Regions:
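Class I S-adenosyl-L-methionine
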Residues: 1-102, 109-128, 210, 214-217, ...
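C-terminal substrate-recognition regions of SAM-dependent nucleic acid methyltransferases
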Residues: 233-370, 375-376, 383-384, 397-449
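Signature of N6-adenine DNA methyltransferases within the class I
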Residues: 52-53, 57-66, 85-95, 105, ...
C-alpha cells in the first residue's frame, strides 16, 4: 500500500527533479529511499508529463484489489493476458499476483502509447516478480486500437483512457469497429477487446451506462454474460473527480445466474437479472433497478418533455441589477412549488440576451424549469420575462400532452426522488438533464389529460 502522502511524493518529485524522465527512471531503479512499489508507482504517475494528454490516471491499489476479487476462474495450464493500456502496470501487477500460483505459466502482451510508462512498468515487474521464472511479458509500444492482432487471449484486463476523440482518427475507428456514434475512446477499447478474449475486464466511465454515444457498445455486450458490474463511484482515481465502473464479461457463455452488482461507495452487493439491467424500454442501463422502481414505472407515462439547456449565459455578462432576471438552480427551492428571489440574484441586459439561444423563451410561461445538477428533482412553471442560466434546464411539453399542478409537485416527492436516483444509477457527477434523463420526467397514467 502507499505509505507516503501525495504531498510528500510531490515534494520528492520537486527535490529530485523527477519530472525529467531520465532522473525519474534512475530514482525508481535505485530506490534510494527504499519506497514501496505502490509509492514508487504513484510517484511515477504524478511525474508523468503526458498524463493529461493521454488521459492516463493513477489507479489506486486498494481499488484494484476490489477488482481482482471478481476476476474469472480460468482452467488452463498457460494463462494468456492482454493489457491494452498498461501505464506503469498498477492493474497488471495485481492481476499477476492473483493468478500466479494457479497456472504453470503466464504470458502477457501489454500495450501503451507512452514509451516511458512501458519502461517504468517493466522495472516494476522485474522488481516484484524476480522469482517468477514462468512469467513472460511482451511490452508493445503502439496504439492497441490500430495494432493488428492475430492471436486470442484468455483475459483482457485494463483501464483504458476515457477521453473524447475526433477527426480522422475517430472516423477510422468508427469504421473499423462498426460504431458510427462513439466519441469516447474507451468505447473502441471495449469493442475491440470483446473480439479478442473469452473474458474481458475493463474499467469504464460510469456514464457508459447512460450516454447515447456508448449505446452501440452497450448493444454489443448486452447478450454476452455480464458476470459483474462494480460501481466504484469516485473512488478509483486519486485526485480525479470522475465516476467509474468495471465490467466483467464472459463473451462465450450465457448468463444463467444473474449479474452481480457491487457498489463500493454504498457498500452493497446485489444479484440482478441481466435482462432487466440491459432492457430496451428505458434509454439507459439500470444497474440498481428494483421492485419499487418497476412498480412506479408501470404507473407512469414517460417521454412527455423535450429539454433545452443553454450554457451561453456566463457570469461575465451578468449583473446584480438589470433588465431581465436570470433564474439559477438556487431560485428553485426543494419544495418544488415556487420560484424565489435570493440575495445573489443576477440579471442580464436585453442587448446581451438578444444574441443567445435562450432568448426565445423570454416571453413564454408555458414551459417548465428544473435544476440541472441535482438528486432532488423538482419542476416549476417558468414565469414570463425571465430566462435561466446553465444550472437550470427548460422542459417543453410534447404536442398533445398537458400537465397539472399535482403532476409537477410529484417530481419533488420522496417517491420520485428515489425513483430518479435509480434511473441515474446513483451517480454523483453525471447528472445533467440531457435527452436521456428527460425521459424519466413522466407522469402517472391516471393523471394523463
Amino acid at each position: 500500500m502507499q505509505k507516503n502522502s501525495d504531498a510528500s511524493l510531490k515534494k520528492l518529485i520537486e527535490e529530485h527533479e523527477l519530472n525529467c524522465f531520465t532522473k525519474s527512471k534512475k530514482f525508481i531503479l535505485d530506490n534510494p529511499l527504499a519506497l514501496s512499489i505502490d509509492d514508487l508507482s504513484r510517484l511515477a504517475e504524478m511525474a508523468n508529463g503526458l498524463q493529461e494528454s493521454t488521459a492516463a490516471y493513477y489507479t489506486d491499489p486498494k481499488t484494484v484489489q476490489t477488482l481482482c476479487q471478481q476476476l474469472p476462474k480460468i482452467h488452463k495450464r498457460t494463462l494468456r493476458i492482454l493489457e491494452p493500456s498498461v501505464g506503469v502496470g498498477n492493474i497488471l501487477r495485481q492481476v499477476i499476483h492473483y493468478y500466479k500460483g494457479l497456472f504453470d505459466s503466464i504470458e502477457c502482451d501489454v500495450f501503451d502509447i507512452n514509451q516511458h510508462s512501458l519502461e517504468i512498468c517493466e522495472i516494476f515487474i522485474q522488481k516484484e516478480f524476480s522469482d517468477f521464472n514462468n512469467l513472460k511479458i511482451n511490452y508493445i509500444y503502439d496504439d492497441f486500437l490500430t495494432h493488428q492482432l492475430e492471436k486470442k487471449y484468455d483475459l483482457v484486463v485494463g483501464n483504458p483512457p476515457f477521453m473524447k476523440i475526433k477527426g480522422v482518427y475517430r472516423e477510422n475507428l468508427r469504421q473499423e469497429f462498426k460504431n458510427p456514434i462513439a466519441d469516447n475512446i474507451s468505447a473502441f477499447f471495449l469493442d475491440k477487446s470483446i473480439g479478442l478474449s473469452n473474458y474481458v475486464v475493463l474499467i469504464m466511465p460510469k456514464y457508459f451506462l447512460h450516454n447515447s454515444d456508448f449505446s452501440m457498445s452497450r448493444e454489443k455486450i448486452k447478450n454476452t454474460n455480464i458476470q459483474c458490474i462494480t460501481d466504484f463511484g469516485e473512488t478509483l482515481f486519486k485526485g480525479v473527480l470522475i465516476e467509474t465502473i468495471c465490467l466483467f464479461l464472459d463473451t462465450k457463455s450465457e448468463n444463467i445466474s444473474g449479474t452481480k452488482v457491487i457498489s463500493v461507495p454504498k457498500k452493497i452487493e446485489l444479484i440482478q437479472d441481466q435482462s432487466e439491467i440491459t432492457q430496451s424500454f428505458f434509454p439507459n442501463w439500470l444497474i440498481y433497478i428494483n421492485e419499487s422502481f418497476k412498480k412506479l414505472a408501470s404507473e407512469m407515462n414517460f417521454g412527455i418533455f423535450n429539454v433545452f439547456r443553454d450554457r451561453q449565459i456566463t457570469s461575465k455578462i451578468l449583473e446584480p441589477t438589470g433588465d431581465i432576471w436570470v433564474i439559477k438552480s438556487k431560485n428553485i427551492p426543494r419544495s418544488g412549488d415556487k420560484i424565489i428571489h435570493i440575495e445573489d440574484d443576477v440579471f442580464i441586459e436585453k442587448s446581451a440576451l438578444s444574441k443567445l439561444g435562450v432568448n426565445k423563451y423570454l416571453k413564454r410561461d408555458d414551459v417548465f424549469l428544473s435544476p440541472n445538477m441535482t438528486y432532488y428533482p423538482r419542476v416549476v412553471v417558468k414565469p414570463k420575462n425571465c430566462v435561466v442560466n446553465g444550472s437550470v434546464a427548460i422542459f417543453e411539453l410534447k404536442p398533445d400532452i398537458s400537465i397539472t399542478e399535482t403532476d409537477l409537485l410529484f417530481f419533488a416527492s420522496p417517491e420520485f426522488e428515489a425513483f430518479y436516483r435509480i434511473a441515474r444509477n446513483h451517480s454523483t457527477r453525471s447528472l445533467n438533464i440531457d435527452n436521456i434523463a428527460i425521459f424519466y420526467f413522466g407522469k402517472r397514467n391516471h393523471c394523463v389529460q
